[in-house]
Amino acid sequence: MAEECRHAADVQRVTPSALGCEECLKTGSTWVHLRLCRTCGHVGCCDDSPNRHATRHFQATGHPIIEGYDPPEGWGWCYVDEVFLDLSDDMTPQNGPIPHYD
């Protein structure tokens, strides 16, 4: 595990791709929390969700940094360096109401 993120400078301002996990919305699945790819804007579900689509997106694309998106939490995670980033001054606004599942 790295001490610092070598990819922090690559964080992009992105437009979220969906109002929920893209893949879960297509299949009717549920999620716990959402993660936003700060390279392309893909919205995927967290690793506590059954399908772990945000991690799958990283594995398929190599896009290194996600943002804790729903709820907005002000942090990022670099999959490559395995470190948290402070995104509290650069949080992505939500595009609209996001469905929630219990």
Language-model segments: what does each one mean?
Residues 3-11, 15-20, 27, 43-102:
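Cys/His-rich, Zn2+-coordinating zinc-finger modules
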Residues 29-38:
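Canonical RING-type zinc finger of E3 ubiquitin-protein ligases
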